Amino acid sequence: MKVKGRVVRGLLTVMAIKALLLSPRIVKAAGPPDTNWMSYNGTVNGQRYSPLDQINVQNVASLTEVCRFKIDDSGTFQAGLVQIDGTLYMTNAHDTLAVDATNCTVRWRNVYKPEQEDVFQINRGVAFANGKLFRGTPDARLLAIDAASGKTLWQQQIGDPTVGEFLSSVPAIWQGLLIAGTAGSDWGIRGRIMAYEQESGREVWRFNTIPRGKELGADTWKDPNSARYGGGGSWTTYTLDMASGEVFAPVGNPAPDFVPSHRPGANLFTDSMVVLDVRTGAIKWWHQMAPNDGLDLDLAAAPMLYWNSKGHPMVVMGSKDGYLYGVDRETRKRVFATPVTTLKKAERSPDARGVYTCPGPVGGVEWNGPAYDQMTKQIVIGSVDWCATIKSDEVEFQPGKLMLAGKWDWDAAKTGWVIAVDPDSGAVKWKYHADSPVVAGITPTAGGVTFTGDMGGNFLAFESATGKVLLKTATGGALAGGVITYALGGKQYVAITSGNVSRLSFGENGKPSLVVYALAAGGQAAATTLATQTATPAGAATAALPPDAGRGMELYGKNCAACHGNKGEGVSGPALKGVHSKLDFAATVNWIENPSAKMPKLYPSTLDAQAVADVAAYVMGL
């Protein structure tokens, strides 16, 4: 009887355990574990793939806005977002911010005060390592910031802004080192890539992207004098192979941009991917896309590493020339070159008559490159479809001045693409034609959904396997930076940058804002218009205070200099020097408020009436 009693008690215990395990509280599906987005492209190999699947093909249409935070009233917002342990880190030209990743509450804000005049007010984000954030500045400083407090730990001048050098890219992180490069190709700098100690900012090594003297590649500059100001800057972050200790760096265009005859030869290492030993900076190999480029077709986005179906290590690059290039890392041979936008190559180099080319100088693949979808085994890339007529001019080198030696006229129409490509052959698997340029980050997920956005302000979600649009929702501002996903507290989030003014801008640009999405309770679909993103009433077109040219200079730098030049010398937009001899103050205000179709419309959503008056006052003094 004792044995029988023990058996009965045992059976009852088993039944009780089963009942407990089957109770609704226990069997309810657990949310995903907390996950971070550690770097500009998520991982150092550049793949941007997320293993999260709470948001999937079946429910992505029910994404809704959780919160948003306006980081500034105007200007560029192209930063790649980073999320570490519940905090989102982001930047604009001068500010670094830490924001709660679930409710957009600001934790701290670090404001950098330039020590010299900015070259170009742009920044692409921060790198994170050992509790520190690292970023560059428009006056060529490298900063280390405490991630917990926002306090600046050290800063190091690593370039000379008086000759056009600045830092727009996110440093790469490798075993106590920071790898960063100077931007400023179009100003006629001599580009270089450098490594610095994370603890002190001390330089460890450097590699000159424009070789001279006995350096490898110097013979590709047939006129050695032209290499003094040959360009070759770095616009964006680098990619790392942690196992081999290699850094894959995209290198920008040669200078002058539009007169290749001034610099005969292949002009290494411009428009190239260079592979360096991360320990020493020694070059291992390179792949050049556009020798002796005369159309500003630089490599502006980070390469991406993956393995093809045959087990070969591959590197893929999206270029401003409109191609996606796949290169076998073992043979160092090109495997495919797939067009990812409209192609119409100019038949000759630019001249005073002008040459028509597709893509134009701000077309093709811009600062966010290809992603790799591990679920569908495909590469996904966004691009800009925008043609232009380029005219060359006299070459004049003045340190610190733009050295385009020409200008361009855009086509009125500009669109974009999101394209999925077979990683073995480069064959196109599907494509989506967007109504506006696509430059935002591409993020595939294990939920079978790929996220991105366009410069028309649309946040997009695709079915990864087919390219079917599952969600298209207005954010109130152009998407030009990070699109990332992470999980906190059992919930998957998607965070984006919305609101940007740049040479790719048009229409309503919106105010630079962080926007965070998650699945809505009850499956409510995301709204296609946002009441929280309101514009200044059109009738409020009178400045309340006298125009302030000093404030106007600051606003001009954020919103106008990309097209018109820091000093109004003209870039892709017309020169504004001496505009006071053609327009009075009222006419200048009217021109800003009612621009041509080729200009961004900044009023009233980005600049209010007071800001317009301030900018007009500054422009009148150029």
Regions found by a protein language model. Give the residues of each.
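Bacterial N-terminal signal peptides
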Residues: 10-23
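Aromatic (tryptophan-biased) beta-strands that constitute blades/sheets of beta-rich domains
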Residues: 30-71, 105-114, 151-160, 202-210, ...
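Repeat-blade elements of multi-bladed beta-propeller folds
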Residues: 34-41, 74-94, 118-142, 166-190, ...
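Hydrophobic/aromatic beta-strand positions that recur at structurally equivalent sites within the blades
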Residues: 55-58, 99-100, 145-146, 196, ...
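Beta-propeller blade signature
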Residues: 145, 191-202, 266-281, 332, ...
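Extracytoplasmic electron-transfer domains, predominantly the class I c-type cytochrome c fold
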Residues: 246, 453, 495-499, 547-549, ...
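Blade-level signature of beta-propeller repeat domains, shared across WD40, Kelch, NHL, RCC1
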Residues: 484-533
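Electrostatic cytochrome c docking/interface patches
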Residues: 531-555
